[in-house]
Amino acid sequence: MATSISLTRYLVEQQRAGGLIPAQLRLLLEVVARACKSISHAVSKGALGDVLGTAGSENVQGEVQKKLDIIANGVLIEANEWGGHLAAMASEEMDGIYLVPHRYPQGEYLLLFDPLDGSSNIDVNVSIGTIFSVLRKPDGERRVEETDFLQPGTRQVAAGYCIYGPQTMLALTVGAGVALFTLDREQGSFVLTQENLRIPEETREFAINMSNMRHWAAPVKRYIDECLQGRSGPRGKDFNMRWVASMVADMHRILSRGGVFLYPWDRREPHKPGKLRLLYEANPMGWLVEQAGGAASNGRQRILEIQPTHLHERVSVILGSKNEVERVALYHGAR
């Protein structure tokens, strides 16, 4: 029987292999993984742990917070603030950045996260997850500022997500492909179950909320309409639609077997370039997809090359199988 490889061993081996992961980053990723295990435990309790329902508050985006949103956010902060690996954190659930208190050692990294993506699905027991991204803080001894987080996705040094479903699984990249780990609940550790995930360039599946079709721009309408025409249309093949309304769940499926995920701009909020957050969702997922051989675009530009202008910036998102993403970009007139 093959020896199982734990997340810790995997990270140590990556550290040894040409210094892909500095020691401080390795330790940070282990702490993030432990926090995800705690969140998984809280999620699995459901009604028995009094963690379902709303918290009676809103986040900076004006969205009603679930109890588990707040619990997961607190778990990630408390787990990471004292280890000496971080200088500051930013979360979809917080207005501003969280500076590591002076009483703790200051590290060289910045951690960004969506503590519980897809939280609208919590009460109906659909897969949800945590998305995270790691950046280096700028050089110097000065205190970290919000502008230090406004780095394009190309500067990420690690990114991943943890999905809480029938199994708890962790997808991770440090710039050398995507590895997938499964939580062994008996051992209490994440175990490597797949390396070098690859998204096929061609697909017959798309993920989008079709109920919003009347609000989309013409290029997205054209793309979806051609997919729906199936074998008798210009694409010459039948497509299936999949939509979980949980980005982590939809993207996990696409990383596992291919597909394209679209969350486009729509006319209901024309002043906003999209719905999903660039720093907490689009950048980490975009890097994972690219590391698996896929593509990530907002329709006109590679997502990872977008220069953020504020902490909670939103973007239009097209992620997944390379040929489909490029087709949607072509319809938008992207070069």
From Swiss-Prot:
Q: Which reaction does it catalyse?
A: beta-D-fructose 1,6-bisphosphate + H2O = beta-D-fructose 6-phosphate + phosphate
What CDD domains does UniProt report for this protein, alphabetically?
A: FBPase
Cite the InterPro entries for this sequence: FBPase_C_dom (IPR044015), FBPase_class-1 (IPR000146), FBPase_N (IPR033391), FBPtase (IPR028343), Fructose_bisphosphatase_AS (IPR020548)
Q: What is its main location?
A: cytoplasm
State the Gene Ontology BP annotations. fructose 1,6-bisphosphate metabolic process; fructose 6-phosphate metabolic process; fructose metabolic process; gluconeogenesis; sucrose biosynthetic process
**Similarity annotation:** Belongs to the FBPase class 1 family.
Alphabetically, the GO molecular function entries are: fructose 1,6-bisphosphate 1-phosphatase activity; magnesium ion binding
Subunit organization: Homotetramer.
Q: Which residues bind Mg(2+) 1?
A: E92, D114, L116
Q: Which SUPFAM superfamilies match?
A: Carbohydrate phosphatase
From the Swiss-Prot or TrEMBL record, give the protein name: Fructose-1,6-bisphosphatase class 1
Instruction: Write the Enzyme Commission number(s) for this entry.
Output: 3.1.3.11
Q: Which residues bind Mg(2+) 2?
A: D114, D117, E281
Q: What top-tier enzyme class does this entry carry?
A: hydrolase
Species of provenance: Verminephrobacter eiseniae (strain EF01-2)
